[in-house]
Amino acid sequence: MAKINLTPKKIYEQEFKTSMRGYDKTEVDEFLDDVIQDYTVYIALVKELQEENAKLKAKVTSASASRPAYASATSEPSHATGNIASASNYDILKRISRLEKEVFGKQIVE
Protein backbone atom coordinates (compact mmCIF):
# COMPACT_ATOMS: atom_id res chain seq x y z
CA MET A 1 0.00 0.00 0.00
CA ALA A 2 1.31 3.46 -0.85
CA LYS A 3 2.30 5.72 2.01
CA ILE A 4 0.69 9.14 2.31
CA ASN A 5 3.45 11.75 2.29
CA LEU A 6 1.44 14.89 2.92
CA THR A 7 -0.70 15.96 5.82
CA PRO A 8 -2.89 19.04 6.01
CA LYS A 9 -0.34 20.59 8.37
CA LYS A 10 2.58 19.96 5.96
CA ILE A 11 0.59 21.48 3.10
CA TYR A 12 -0.25 24.52 5.20
CA GLU A 13 3.35 25.05 6.32
CA GLN A 14 4.88 24.56 2.87
CA GLU A 15 6.97 27.56 1.80
CA PHE A 16 7.52 28.37 -1.87
CA LYS A 17 10.46 30.20 -3.33
CA THR A 18 9.65 33.52 -4.89
CA SER A 19 11.02 34.76 -8.14
CA MET A 20 10.67 37.88 -10.17
CA ARG A 21 7.78 36.51 -12.16
CA GLY A 22 6.31 34.07 -9.63
CA TYR A 23 2.76 32.91 -9.06
CA ASP A 24 0.14 35.07 -7.37
CA LYS A 25 0.57 34.30 -3.68
CA THR A 26 -3.12 34.68 -2.80
CA GLU A 27 -4.14 32.37 -5.62
CA VAL A 28 -1.66 29.72 -4.44
CA ASP A 29 -2.86 30.13 -0.85
CA GLU A 30 -6.51 29.73 -1.88
CA PHE A 31 -5.68 26.62 -3.86
CA LEU A 32 -3.70 25.15 -0.99
CA ASP A 33 -6.62 25.86 1.35
CA ASP A 34 -8.83 23.79 -0.95
CA VAL A 35 -6.22 21.02 -1.02
CA ILE A 36 -6.05 21.04 2.79
CA GLN A 37 -9.83 20.75 3.07
CA ASP A 38 -9.92 17.86 0.61
CA TYR A 39 -7.01 16.15 2.32
CA THR A 40 -8.75 16.42 5.69
CA VAL A 41 -11.87 14.83 4.22
CA TYR A 42 -9.80 12.05 2.63
CA ILE A 43 -8.06 11.27 5.92
CA ALA A 44 -11.39 11.08 7.76
CA LEU A 45 -12.86 8.89 5.02
CA VAL A 46 -9.89 6.51 5.04
CA LYS A 47 -10.08 6.23 8.82
CA GLU A 48 -13.82 5.50 8.67
CA LEU A 49 -13.33 2.86 5.97
CA GLN A 50 -10.51 1.21 7.92
CA GLU A 51 -12.75 0.95 10.98
CA GLU A 52 -15.58 -0.50 8.89
CA ASN A 53 -13.15 -2.95 7.30
CA ALA A 54 -11.94 -4.09 10.73
CA LYS A 55 -15.54 -4.62 11.89
CA LEU A 56 -16.40 -6.63 8.78
CA LYS A 57 -13.28 -8.77 9.13
CA ALA A 58 -14.24 -9.49 12.74
CA LYS A 59 -17.74 -10.46 11.58
CA VAL A 60 -16.32 -12.81 8.95
CA THR A 61 -14.01 -14.39 11.50
CA SER A 62 -16.82 -14.97 13.98
CA ALA A 63 -19.13 -16.28 11.26
CA SER A 64 -16.54 -18.70 9.93
CA ALA A 65 -15.82 -19.91 13.47
CA SER A 66 -19.48 -20.85 13.97
CA ARG A 67 -19.89 -22.28 10.46
CA PRO A 68 -18.65 -25.88 10.96
CA ALA A 69 -21.68 -26.75 13.10
CA TYR A 70 -24.01 -25.75 10.28
CA ALA A 71 -21.86 -27.15 7.49
CA SER A 72 -21.93 -30.72 8.79
CA ALA A 73 -25.72 -30.69 9.01
CA THR A 74 -26.23 -29.42 5.46
CA SER A 75 -23.27 -30.91 3.61
CA GLU A 76 -24.69 -34.44 3.32
CA PRO A 77 -27.83 -34.70 1.20
CA SER A 78 -30.30 -37.28 2.39
CA HIS A 79 -30.64 -40.51 0.45
CA ALA A 80 -34.31 -39.81 -0.20
CA THR A 81 -33.51 -36.74 -2.29
CA GLY A 82 -30.84 -38.72 -4.17
CA ASN A 83 -33.42 -41.39 -5.09
CA ILE A 84 -35.90 -38.76 -6.22
CA ALA A 85 -33.26 -37.09 -8.40
CA SER A 86 -32.24 -40.38 -10.02
CA ALA A 87 -35.89 -41.35 -10.58
CA SER A 88 -36.66 -38.02 -12.17
CA ASN A 89 -33.54 -38.29 -14.37
CA TYR A 90 -34.71 -41.70 -15.53
CA ASP A 91 -38.16 -40.31 -16.33
CA ILE A 92 -36.63 -37.40 -18.23
CA LEU A 93 -34.43 -39.73 -20.28
CA LYS A 94 -37.41 -41.93 -21.16
CA ARG A 95 -39.39 -38.90 -22.21
CA ILE A 96 -36.54 -37.54 -24.37
CA SER A 97 -36.14 -40.93 -26.00
CA ARG A 98 -39.85 -41.10 -26.82
CA LEU A 99 -39.83 -37.57 -28.26
CA GLU A 100 -36.75 -38.31 -30.39
CA LYS A 101 -38.40 -41.42 -31.81
CA GLU A 102 -41.49 -39.42 -32.62
CA VAL A 103 -39.60 -36.52 -34.27
CA PHE A 104 -36.90 -38.46 -36.09
CA GLY A 105 -39.22 -41.34 -36.96
CA LYS A 106 -41.42 -38.96 -38.98
CA GLN A 107 -38.40 -37.52 -40.81
CA ILE A 108 -37.26 -40.96 -41.95
CA VAL A 109 -40.73 -41.78 -43.35
CA GLU A 110 -40.90 -38.55 -45.36
Curated annotation (Swiss-Prot):
The family database entries (InterPro entries) matched by this protein are listed as: Cell_cycle_GpsB, DivIVA_domain, DivIVA_fam
Annotated compartments: Cytoplasm
The UniProt record lists the keyword Cell membrane: no
Q: Does the keyword Cell wall biogenesis/degradation apply?
A: no
User: Which domain of life does this protein belong to?
Assistant: Bacteria
Q: Which family does it belong to?
A: Belongs to the GpsB family.
Function, as annotated: Divisome component that associates with the complex late in its assembly, after the Z-ring is formed, and is dependent on DivIC and PBP2B for its recruitment to the divisome. Together with EzrA, is a key component of the system that regulates PBP1 localization during cell cycle progression. Its main role could be the removal of PBP1 from the cell pole after pole maturation is completed. Also contributes to the recruitment of PBP1 to the division complex. Not essential for septum formation.
Its recorded name reads: Cell cycle protein GpsB
What is the scientific name of the source organism? Streptococcus thermophilus (strain ATCC BAA-491 / LMD-9)
